[in-house]
Amino acid sequence: MLRAVGSLLRLGRGLTVRCGPGAPLEATRRPAPALPPRGLPCYSSGGAPSNSGPQGHGEIHRVPTQRRPSQFDKKILLWTGRFKSMEEIPPRIPPEMIDTARNKARVKACYIMIGLTIIACFAVIVSAKRAVERHESLTSWNLAKKAKWREEAALAAQAKAK
C-alpha cells in the first residue's frame, strides 16, 4: 500500500521513504502502530467487555445488559411460564430472557394456528357432507341464480314492451 503524506512515502507497514524535493532518498523503519482489535467486543452479563483495555479509534457503544419489560413483555413472560405471577417479575430483565420468551410465544401461537386450521378443515368437511345429503352443490346454486336472472330480465322486457 502506497500513501503519500506530506514529503513522506509510506510503503506498507513501518517502511517510510522521504520523497520530497531535495530530500535524501533513504528508507527508515518505524514500528508499526498498534491496531485496534477487529470485531466488536463481547460483553458478559456483568457489563464489562471481555477484551477490555485501551480502546483504539472512536468509541464503542455499550449494549445494555438489562432493560425494563413492557406490559406486553410481562404478559409474554407469564404466558410462556418463565414467571408464575406478575409480582415475581423483576423490574429489570436481560434482553436475552425477553427474546427467548418472545420466541417461545411465537412457537406457541404457531401451534395454536395449526390446531385451529385443522379444526376448520374438519368443520368444512362436515358441512360439505351435510350439503351433499341435502342435494346442494355450487352447480345447482349457480343454475338457480341464473334462472332467477332470466326471469327478472324477461319481466323487465315485458314491462318495457307495454
From Swiss-Prot:
Transmembrane in keyword set: yes
InterPro entries registered for this protein in UniProt: DUF1075
Record-linked Pfam families: DUF1075
Subcellular location: Membrane
GO cellular component term of the entry, any: membrane
Chief location category: membrane
Ranges where the record places region Disordered: 26-69
Ranges that cross the membrane: 107-127
Membrane topology listed for this record: Single-pass membrane protein
Keywords: Membrane, Transmembrane, Transmembrane helix
PANTHER family: GROWTH AND TRANSFORMATION-DEPENDENT PROTEIN (PTHR13674), PROTEIN FAM162B (PTHR13674:SF3)
Family: Belongs to the UPF0389 family.
Protein's recorded name: Protein FAM162B
Species the sequence originates in: Homo sapiens (Human)
